[in-house]
Amino acid sequence: MSEFTLYPAIDMRNGKCVRLVQGDYDQETIYGDSPLDMATRFANEGAKWIHLVDLDGAKAGNRVNHEHVLAIASSLDVKVQIGGGIRTEEDVAFYINNGVARVILGSSAVSNSAFVKKMLAQYGEKIAIGIDARNGFVSTEGWLETSKVKAEDLGKELAKEGAEVFIFTDIQMDGMLAGPNVESTVRLAEATGKQVIASGGISSVADLQKLSAQKQTGVSGAIIGKALYTERFTLAEAIEGLDRV
């Protein structure tokens, strides 16, 4: 397996860097006025990737904060992955043609599987499938709806269609700093035989070490958000902690 990659997260709403609790738009904390400044800070601490979420886009169903995404992709020596409201071929092409390394397709994977399969066929590893689950079932529409589809079943189906990278979020853990759902992340990796990036709940370097210890199952990285913003640890400390394992 390749190395374990850390993805510092920048969630964008109204052009600012924010965090929500469990995806609740009414529980918002603003951490900065400039996504580019935040990304620059992470790059200076050693980030190789930046994970961007367009929260306005997730709600609206089309891209909203794309100018900030392109500013980061074009001016920093990091790879960028973007999710949030990307539901059309035009939006996928827009990002990939403008220097974004990976586009995350989320709720459309349930509601419009033909679109997702077409994008996988066209762009391969530049597409990541975001699987957000609540109690093991896939959640859609910016976490506002829960489907009757099991996370592993969706993963297996899309792996057959060419998906190489999944991002798994346990919604109940997200923004709670209660530790990641390692078991569910590993289950998805084993079910699909593909790379799975863990997201949600990471509160310590020890949490990252637990996930990194599952590299052989296919758990290939972790997205870190609130822990960095609430200064539980710095990105530099996380990188150093993984180097020691």
From Swiss-Prot:
<dbReference type="GO" id="GO:0005737">
    <property type="term" value="C:cytoplasm"/>
</dbReference>
<comment type="pathway">
    <text>Amino-acid biosynthesis; L-histidine biosynthesis; L-histidine from 5-phospho-alpha-D-ribose 1-diphosphate: step 4/9.</text>
</comment>
<protein>
    <recommendedName>
        <fullName>1-(5-phosphoribosyl)-5-[(5-phosphoribosylamino)methylideneamino] imidazole-4-carboxamide isomerase</fullName>
        <ecNumber>5.3.1.16</ecNumber>
    </recommendedName>
</protein>
<keyword id="KW-0413">Isomerase</keyword>
<feature type="active site" description="Proton acceptor">
    <location>
        <position position="11"/>
    </location>
</feature>
<dbReference type="GO" id="GO:0000162">
    <property type="term" value="P:L-tryptophan biosynthetic process"/>
</dbReference>
<dbReference type="GO" id="GO:0003949">
    <property type="term" value="F:1-(5-phosphoribosyl)-5-[(5-phosphoribosylamino)methylideneamino]imidazole-4-carboxamide isomerase activity"/>
</dbReference>
<keyword id="KW-0368">Histidine biosynthesis</keyword>
<dbReference type="InterPro" id="IPR023016">
    <property type="entry name" value="Isoase_HisA-like_bact"/>
</dbReference>
<dbReference type="InterPro" id="IPR013785">
    <property type="entry name" value="Aldolase_TIM"/>
</dbReference>
<dbReference type="InterPro" id="IPR006063">
    <property type="entry name" value="HisA_bact_arch"/>
</dbReference>
<dbReference type="InterPro" id="IPR011060">
    <property type="entry name" value="RibuloseP-bd_barrel"/>
</dbReference>
<dbReference type="GO" id="GO:0000105">
    <property type="term" value="P:L-histidine biosynthetic process"/>
</dbReference>
<dbReference type="InterPro" id="IPR044524">
    <property type="entry name" value="Isoase_HisA-like"/>
</dbReference>
<comment type="similarity">
    <text>Belongs to the HisA/HisF family.</text>
</comment>
<keyword id="KW-0963">Cytoplasm</keyword>
<feature type="active site" description="Proton donor">
    <location>
        <position position="132"/>
    </location>
</feature>
<dbReference type="InterPro" id="IPR006062">
    <property type="entry name" value="His_biosynth"/>
</dbReference>
<keyword id="KW-0028">Amino-acid biosynthesis</keyword>
<dbReference type="Pfam" id="PF00977">
    <property type="entry name" value="His_biosynth"/>
</dbReference>
